[in-house]
């Protein structure tokens, strides 16, 4: 094997936590190598060591057989290591050329920025990737996929020979993800080594050569993709066998009360008019392609965005939901797609996040908060949803994705909501945590909660939902239930429109 990167006996500890224990990793030139593990397994810490962001307590890094010590990120870049973070590091108002050469602009002989040379170099990089990018458009005007390609181009412009891709498909459509995989295969052909981090095991099998699994900061195994399967990988990641990610669906009660009725919703004048109902104890899925109107519909219902016409009833009573505060008073909570920026204050503690929308509940005097009562309630809802953390004072930023999602759920339970909207509830969450979230959702519906689940993952829609509203171009094309909920039927409606099924079963 033509080894380009070797990490040997890497150990790293933080106060009270041993993040990595004697980790080995070996990558070949021109190899796409998957790094797998649950959240908290040590993947991010190991990659931050490789990028010079953290320094190991013990262990060595070798590139092309030469031992390297990275004091910071710039040392790693100089050695040929590049990383494309899940959260982009691009400047939105600058174009692709300026983003590629930010801080290292090419100069002419008079010392002025040589825009022509930089533009030519940028065009050559994107030609190497086989992508078309408008070099003069600001980054904010590009699609998410195009921004991803600019990030990759930025790493390649720094002569990266080892490229780390951290959850690169998290915000891409299936077609965009396939385009990314084509780019990865081309870079592989050119000899670039890639470390691919993803929670989507189907992607691992589609594009990777070998897999290394970490668990609880320890090395578990390295195996060829061709010699393993999904069940074996899951067992290696979580240390146990997961029989099924999805809990069994309960028999739907025919007399379950309607807790939410959207009798008329038109977001824009002249646009489609949608109607749907939600019953106590059920999960209603919103399915469709990215941009089909699923999230837009949910946001319009709760008043987060304006609607041209809207008629909403909660438990039979007409309500005016002009903003999310109105929705909250009506008992509707939302777990937004971007939990870190919209659902949580990550610098706050678990206690403060759970109490955030309900501080009046703990007011002991006019301006004082009953901290003991707040702590008791926080402990209670943490136990109910299964948040794993050392204390209620733990900063939310230090939690895994699955535990962060549970904190958002705990907040709404603390507020006595009856309708919960989950927008991409398992995005960026590992296999074991996904199963926990699914189980929690079913526990909530068993207690009478009603859930709307917006998801781009078809297996999730099919495995979790009692009924599914399929969106296409802003319109609910059909509402499916029972045996109608299968991948082929959902995708047919999402891509080709109505074939004559019932629009809104009772």
Swiss-Prot record:
Domain ABC transporter span(s) in chain numbering: 5-241, 251-498
Major enzyme class: translocase
Topology relative to the membrane: Peripheral membrane protein
Residues annotated as binding ATP: 37-44
EC number: 7.5.2.7
PROSITE patterns: ABC_TRANSPORTER_1 (PS00211), ABC_TRANSPORTER_2 (PS50893), RBSA (PS51254)
Residue ranges crossing the lipid bilayer per the database entry: none
Keyword Nuclease in annotation: no
GO terms for MF: ABC-type D-ribose transporter activity; ATP binding; ATP hydrolysis activity
InterPro entries from the UniProt entry: AAA+_ATPase, ABC_carbohydrate_import_ATPase, ABC_transporter-like_ATP-bd, ABC_transporter-like_CS, P-loop_NTPase
Assembly information from the UniProt record: The complex is composed of an ATP-binding protein (RbsA), two transmembrane proteins (RbsC) and a solute-binding protein (RbsB).
Name of protein: Ribose import ATP-binding protein RbsA 2
Organism in which the protein naturally occurs: Burkholderia lata (strain ATCC 17760 / DSM 23089 / LMG 22485 / NCIMB 9086 / R18194 / 383)
